[in-house]
């Protein structure tokens, strides 16, 4: 949470999103609205492109829903909405899908970027492939045969 807050603080202090370009952490910034169809993506860094396999031009202007799929936990997404509205921040894990529709477990922290009046201008999401962190390589979800 502290890293995400530090990045958001740099943006609030007037830094351009470009200060995040060379960051090794995967970062996505969306609009500040939470209403449907959801906040549109306004910035991603190279680490996020590598994580999800989508190039920046395909991500910008769409919503994070493009990374969700059949087995994405809808209850966790509902918790995300509730916590952002109630507390203005969120930490959790969820199953996402890369461009090839391969599953990966995403650990993410979402914090606000506020304007001078204190209103939420954007949401900054710091994202980690949880299985990669554990195994040291690109994590894949392995489902047991039934």
What are these regions (language model features)?
Residues 70-95, 100-102:
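Terminal output helix/cap of sensory domains in signal transduction proteins
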Residues 1-38, 120-146:
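PAS-family sensory modules
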Residues 48-59:
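PAS/PAS-like sensory domain cap-loop motif
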Residues 32-34, 93, 95-101, 108-111, 114-115, 126:
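PAS-family sensory domains
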Residues 103, 119-120:
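Glycine-rich acetyl-CoA-binding "A-motif" of GNAT/NAT acetyltransferases
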Residues 60-71:
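PAS-family sensory/regulatory domains
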